[in-house]
């Protein structure tokens, strides 16, 4: 690939692997900004449950693509793709080094690999009908019309199941038949972050979330946007809702959130290895290894 193309650095890794802290150190060293590639941190007022970079961290290093929309207005992959590519191109025009950080593989690859994403807006009436059917029935429907998608979507992932059905019913085409468009003209270095003690890190982060106030944050979101806000069905918020409804205890919520997050992290790592194949960083000295790899790439 031509060295005349704009350079773009990417840091990917599963949830709770420490991407935020490492990314800030890397951004400080290379005097650049961070483009946040996360499917939930794009929403305002969802700070604790998404482990969003703190206000102090955001003051230290400028973050793009955080708090860009209210949770009541979902941003699909197609919309995020356009917003993110515009932001990155703006950085390139200013001769800055775009630095993309995140754990949402689909969102990341839609930006860097040029995935075609159908521009299908939310179909509220259809969604209500599908939600009334329940996840098992929706899963069976998806298996009939788009069996390949059921191999990529977790059985318990209600949001992605409904989205796949939504795309099929609106376009008549399975979501799994999406094709890759021409990728952006960027020279990309992908770095991967993983941890040997990831399960312990996930447990600790989950405990921190509940002690920091995810239940109160969930209650605030419910009071502002309603109990049926779709994003509150995602990991952490769903369990906090159950506590608020007296259907669960905090200890059980922590246990279930931890289990679901570990399962999610496993799927993330599988995605990264199959779809991205990054240069994995040495856990013994992450920052030093990242700097060496980036400087070698840029030289």
Curated annotation (Swiss-Prot):
Location of the region described as Interaction with substrate tRNA in the Swiss-Prot/TrEMBL record: 38-41
Domain of life: Bacteria
Record: residues binding substrate: 15-20
UniProt-recorded Gene Ontology molecular function terms: ATP binding; tRNA dimethylallyltransferase activity
Known EC number: 2.5.1.75
Cofactors (names): Mg(2+)
Keyword ATP-binding: yes
Pfam families the UniProt entry points to: IPPT
Keyword check for Lipid biosynthesis: no
Site (Interaction with substrate tRNA): 104
Catalysed conversion reaction: adenosine(37) in tRNA + dimethylallyl diphosphate = N(6)-dimethylallyladenosine(37) in tRNA + diphosphate
Biological process according to GO: tRNA modification
Family annotation (PANTHER family): TRNA DIMETHYLALLYLTRANSFERASE
UniProt xrefs under HAMAP family: IPP_trans (MF_00185)
Function recorded in the entry: Catalyzes the transfer of a dimethylallyl group onto the adenine at position 37 in tRNAs that read codons beginning with uridine, leading to the formation of N6-(dimethylallyl)adenosine (i(6)A).
The family this protein is said to belong to: Belongs to the IPP transferase family.
Assembly mode: Monomer.
Protein known as: tRNA dimethylallyltransferase
Gene: miaA
């Amino acid at each position: 690939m031509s060295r005349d193309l704009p350079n773009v650095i990417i840091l990917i890794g599963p949830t709770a692997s420490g991407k935020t802290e490492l990314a800030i150190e890397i951004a400080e060293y290379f005097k650049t900004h961070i483009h946040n590639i996360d499917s939930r941190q794009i929403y305002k007022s969802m700070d604790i449950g998404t482990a969003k970079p703190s206000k102090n961290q955001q003051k230290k290093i400028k973050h793009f693509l955080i708090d860009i929309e209210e949770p009541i207005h979902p941003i699909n992959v197609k919309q995020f793709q356009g917003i993110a590519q515009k932001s990155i191109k703006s950085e390139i025009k200013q001769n800055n080094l775009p630095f993309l950080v995140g754990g949402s593989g689909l969102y990341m690859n839609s930006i860097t690999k040029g995935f075609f994403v159908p521009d299908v807006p939310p179909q509220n009436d259809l969604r209500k009908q599908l939600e009334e059917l329940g996840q098992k029935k929706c899963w069976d429907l998806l298996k009939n019309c788009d069996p390949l998608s059921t191999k990529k979507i977790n059985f318990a992932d209600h949001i992605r199941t409904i989205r796949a059905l939504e795309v099929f019913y609106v376009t008549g085409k399975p979501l799994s038949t999406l094709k890759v468009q021409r990728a952006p003209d960027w020279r990309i270095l992908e770095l991967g972050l993983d941890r040997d003690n990831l399960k312990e890190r996930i447990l600790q982060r989950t405990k921190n979330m509940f002690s920091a106030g995810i239940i109160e944050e969930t209650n605030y979101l419910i009071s502002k946007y309603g109990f049926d806000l779709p994003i509150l069905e995602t990991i952490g918020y769903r369990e906090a809702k159950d506590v608020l409804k007296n259907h669960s205890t905090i200890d059980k919520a922590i246990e279930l959130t931890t289990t679901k997050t570990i399962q999610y992290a496993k799927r993330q790592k599988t995605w990264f290895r199959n779809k991205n194949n990054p240069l994995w960083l040495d856990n013994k000295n992450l920052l030093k290894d990242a700097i060496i790899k980036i400087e070698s790439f840029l030289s």
